[in-house]
C-alpha cells in the first residue's frame, strides 16, 4: 500500500482517510488539475476472493450509475495497477460522527434537517435500485449549510447483482450498531435495510446514543433481533409524537412493517399530519427465542461463533438455546 508523499500515476498521496479489511483509503491530489481526490486501494490478496472481487466491480458500477450532488463520482479505475485502485470525487464536510462527539444530542430541528437531507439522497439511490447497506454516522458528511453527503459504497448492493456468499453464511456485512435484523440473519438486504439504518441514526441524533450497543458485537446484534430500545420520549422531552412514530416504524424488526423505501420515509418527514401515531404503542415482538445474557457475554462462546461467521453465529446461538 502507498504512503503519504508517494506518487501513483498522476496522483500524489496526501493523507490517510481510513482502512478496512479489503481496502485502504487516502486523500490525494490530481497533478493534472490540482484538485483533491480520494484514492481507494484494494488489497490484491483479497481480490483473489470472489466476494471481494465482485464488490470491487459493484462499487465501480454503482459509482458510475449514481449522478447526484452528495454522492461521490468514480473518476478513474485502475484495475491493472498494483495494487488496484479507484479514484473518487473528494467530498467536503464534517463527519456526522465528529459532530455527535462534540454535541451528542442535536436540537430537534437540526436532527430533522440532517435526516431529511440524508433520506432524500438515499431515496435517489433506491430509485436507481442501489442499497447502501452501511449507513452510519462515520459514512455521512455534513456541510455548514446542512447539506449532506454519503460516502463509502464499498458494500452497497445493486439490485439483481449476483450473490457472492452462500445464503445464510454471509460474513459481517455492515456495522453491528447499525445492522438491520435481516443483515444479521445473513440476508442480502434491500431498501428497508437502509430505512432501518436511517431510523437508528435519527434515534441517535435525538437520544445522544445508539439504540442498541454493547462491547460484545454478538450481544449488540442479538439486541436488534429481540430487544426494544428505550422510547425516545422517555429519554428526552420535547420530541414531537410524529417524530417518535417515524423512528418506531423505521426500526420495526420485520422489514415488511417498515417504510417501503427511503422515499416513503421522506414523505412522512415532510407530511407529519399523515403519520400514524398508533405506532407509538404497537408492540414489536422478538424475532427469536430469548438468549441467556451470561452465554452471549462469555468470550469463549463468542470467539467460537465468530469463527464460523457472524450471521451463522447468531443463528447457532439461538438454536443452542432452543434445545
Annotate each language-model stretch with its function.
Residues 81-95, 99:
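Conserved short submotifs of the Hanks-type protein kinase catalytic core
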Residues 43-65:
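AlphaC helix of the eukaryotic protein kinase fold
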Residues 114-115:
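Activation segment signature within eukaryotic-like protein kinase domains
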Residues 175-277:
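C-terminal lobe helix-coil module of Hanks-type protein kinase domains
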Residues 77:
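Activation-segment/catalytic-loop signature of the eukaryotic protein kinase fold
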Residues 145, 151-181, 185-188:
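Activation segment of protein kinases
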Residues 14-20, 25:
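Protein kinase glycine-rich loop
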Residues 120-130:
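Protein kinase catalytic-loop region centered on the HRD/HxD motif
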